[in-house]
């Protein structure tokens, strides 16, 4: 029996693009190896990170509400068709392909240094017909850790301490991103009411102002 996962995801964009999305009921995929999860339609699992994306573009509250928007998406996907890089099995597959590409130079046209970006690896995995990832998976899910500088300062002060226990393990802000490879799993798109949550999000950005580079 197939098990399905229902996700509510968030996509930040400018107002004109949001209006086109709502009119056409589709989001055009981002393309290129510079996108860290490869080609696809990008979402955040938490509303705040979608807000953070548009906040980088416009920090004035009124102009932000006027010129930017967040799209809320309902996504339904078979659990087995999610390539989840927070899971050991899928992370190992990625790591093996990463090592293979970097050691054998499979993508000489894309490699410019000794190491390659995640987007090169994931696009290779999903575009290579022999590997068949594009037929097996509809979604790529991954954790993007944002370093929190306040913890880094604490660790720097503790460098000379001899006990290993000084290491802090929650020195990042967790940001889960989802890259939809198969648009058919997107079942519904609607406007997110940013006015109801913007003041709360502004408090969050103020707390993490230094860490987020705002």
Curated annotation (Swiss-Prot):
Top-level taxonomic group: Archaea
SUPFAM superfamilies linked to this entry: ADP-ribosylation
Protein name: Uncharacterized protein MJ0359
Organism listed in the record: Methanocaldococcus jannaschii (strain ATCC 43067 / DSM 2661 / JAL-1 / JCM 10045 / NBRC 100440)
